[in-house]
């Protein structure tokens, strides 16, 4: 820029609209067309594109109908809580719409048989099993910059081991190395993710902070950078078992939206994750239907429009599984009442005392 363009205008009588136009044209000449614009001038900027999580209840709790594209998502929780299952179901939903998906398997633990059962098209899933954290994040950066990938999952942040740690000896102390790696990578990635409209899901693990007297001792790995860059953070927990007589056939799962830049946060939803099947859609229809008043519950009996679905929740689920048209009708009614259901999620899942950090990040 020339010195004249940097001159500060001090005259109070100057026409502000003309001064603004001159400034905008100067910025566009220097940095290219589209480097600055009025937000409402481009309708595509305002609209939020989403991809379903595979859980109707979670889609409603997120407030925008699913996970937003062009954003960073973090899914964290204890071991065997359903983190990878939720990510794989999001991939399956994206593939149903013709999207291209990639899975960076830093843990080297992806089970292709289980992924296929969840509906993932393995023939069209890109997979990488990198040796180091730097390699994993370089691959992620290259795929995002290509603009051809719709959903990219990194499993997990805890397994992104810096090269210096791998080449060093056991017992070497390298404090903050992984946190610095994540901080640098996210600084590079965030603009590319927004421009390419790629959804990047980071799966994360939980660690315990030593010496915490008050509040939750839990924290996620990889430093604080991901907490700030993530538009949505999901805390997923196993809260019980789903049994058929004495046999355990699934997990009762609770997901809490601890951070959400797209809609009000702190909503929580509960659903069943069945072994070899994923999220139980029929179970969600029964539970959400009762919550919204669409499905009537009288004693142990469930009914819809005076038609009995079954005695007991499992029988009602079986009936809906055998009658997909009726299940689709209930789902349509639930989506039309999504606002009402979301308000009830907020009432049930207000912020816990431990969520102060998450609230402060917003």
From Swiss-Prot:
GO biological process: DNA recombination; DNA repair; SOS response
Subcellular location: Cytoplasm
Primary location: cytoplasm
Keywords from the UniProt entry: ATP-binding, Cytoplasm, DNA damage, DNA recombination, DNA repair, DNA-binding, Nucleotide-binding, SOS response
Matching InterPro entries: AAA+_ATPase, DNA_recomb/repair_RecA, DNA_recomb/repair_RecA_CS, P-loop_NTPase, RecA-like_C, RecA-like_N, RecA_ATP-bd, RecA_C_sf
A Pfam family: RecA_C
Gene Ontology MF terms in the entry: ATP binding; ATP hydrolysis activity; ATP-dependent DNA damage sensor activity; damaged DNA binding; single-stranded DNA binding
Binding site for ATP: 77-84
GO CC entries: cytosol
Family as reported in the entry's similarity comment: Belongs to the RecA family.
Function: Can catalyze the hydrolysis of ATP in the presence of single-stranded DNA, the ATP-dependent uptake of single-stranded DNA by duplex DNA, and the ATP-dependent hybridization of homologous single-stranded DNAs. It interacts with LexA causing its activation and leading to its autocatalytic cleavage.
Name of the protein this chain belongs to: Protein RecA
Organism: Rhizobium leguminosarum bv. trifolii (strain WSM2304)
């Amino acid at each position: 820029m020339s010195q004249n363009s940097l001159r500060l205008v001090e005259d109070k009588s100057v026409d502000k609209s003309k001064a603004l136009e001159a400034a905008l044209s100067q910025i566009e000449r220097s940095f290219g067309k589209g480097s600055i614009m009025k937000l409402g001038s481009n309708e595509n900027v305002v609209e939020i594109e989403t991809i379903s999580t595979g859980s109707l209840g979670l889609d409603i709790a997120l407030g925008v109908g699913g996970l937003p594209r062009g954003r960073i998502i973090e899914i964290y929780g204890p071991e065997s809580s359903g983190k990878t299952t939720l990510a794989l179901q999001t991939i399956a939903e994206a593939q149903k719409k013709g999207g291209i998906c990639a899975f960076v398997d830093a843990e080297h633990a992806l089970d292709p048989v289980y992924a296929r059962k969840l509906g993932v098209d393995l023939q069209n899933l890109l997979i990488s099993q990198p040796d180091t954290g730097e390699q994993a994040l370089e691959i992620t950066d290259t795929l995002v910059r290509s603009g051809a990938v719709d959903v990219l999952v990194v499993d997990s942040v805890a397994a992104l081991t810096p090269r210096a740690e791998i080449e060093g000896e056991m017992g070497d102390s390298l404090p903050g190395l992984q946190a610095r790696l994540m901080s640098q990578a996210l600084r590079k990635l965030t603009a590319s993710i927004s421009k390419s409209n790629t959804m990047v899901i980071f799966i994360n693990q939980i660690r315990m902070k030593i010496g915490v007297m008050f509040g939750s001792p839990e924290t996620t790995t990889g430093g604080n950078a991901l907490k700030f860059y993530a538009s949505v953070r999901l805390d997923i927990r196993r809260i019980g078992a789903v049994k058929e007589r004495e046999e355990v056939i699934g997990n009762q799962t609770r997901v809490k939206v601890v951070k959400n830049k797209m809609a009000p946060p702190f909503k929580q939803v509960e659903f069943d994750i069945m072994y070899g099947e994923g999220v139980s859609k029929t179970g969600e229809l029964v539970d959400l239907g009762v919550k919204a008043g669409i499905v009537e519950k009288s004693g142990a009996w469930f009914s819809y429009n005076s038609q009995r679905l079954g005695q007991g929740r499992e029988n009602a689920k079986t009936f809906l599984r055998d009658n997909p048209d009726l299940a689709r009708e209930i789902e349509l009614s639930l989506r039309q009442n999504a606002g009402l259901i979301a308000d009830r999620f907020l009432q049930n899942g207000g912020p816990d005392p431990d969520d102060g950090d998450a609230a402060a990040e917003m």
